[in-house]
């Protein structure tokens, strides 16, 4: 099993797919990496040579921000928005959707489970 930037890549998948297991690398970026390093995208992870693994590792570390570094940067950006008090920061602080989605209905993932409020009793 090849290990790149702290992630074990699945052995039986094509390299194009296996690289997407790294946080910060999607399909397009994985294709760019393989093209830049000259590795066939249809090659399986288990068929990689040690030289190819080293080549991939060096390219990713030199050119991309992935895994822990990327997560830290995203968290720092969110913290900065909260500190400066911009609208997006307020939405983050309140645990509401940040990008303009509706909240009258939906947004349950962000808001959490419903908190039922007792309504009026029926008049007789």
Curated annotation (Swiss-Prot):
Keywords: Ribonucleoprotein, Ribosomal protein, RNA-binding, rRNA-binding, tRNA-binding
GO MF term set: rRNA binding; structural constituent of ribosome; tRNA binding
BP GO terms, sorted: translation
Cited InterPro entries: Rbsml_uS13_C, Ribosomal_uS13, Ribosomal_uS13-like_H2TH, Ribosomal_uS13_bac-type, Ribosomal_uS13_CS
Domain of life: Bacteria
Gene Ontology CC terms, in alphabetical order: cytosol; small ribosomal subunit
Region (Disordered): 95-124
Annotated Pfam families: Ribosomal_S13
Gene3D superfamilies: 1.10.8.50, 30s ribosomal protein s13, domain 2
Subunit record text: Part of the 30S ribosomal subunit. Forms a loose heterodimer with protein S19. Forms two bridges to the 50S subunit in the 70S ribosome.
PANTHER family per record: 30S RIBOSOMAL PROTEIN S13/40S RIBOSOMAL PROTEIN S18, SMALL RIBOSOMAL SUBUNIT PROTEIN US13M
Physiological role: Located at the top of the head of the 30S subunit, it contacts several helices of the 16S rRNA. In the 70S ribosome it contacts the 23S rRNA (bridge B1a) and protein L5 of the 50S subunit (bridge B1b), connecting the 2 subunits; these bridges are implicated in subunit movement. Contacts the tRNAs in the A and P-sites.
Similarity comment: Belongs to the universal ribosomal protein uS13 family.
Record-given protein name: Small ribosomal subunit protein uS13
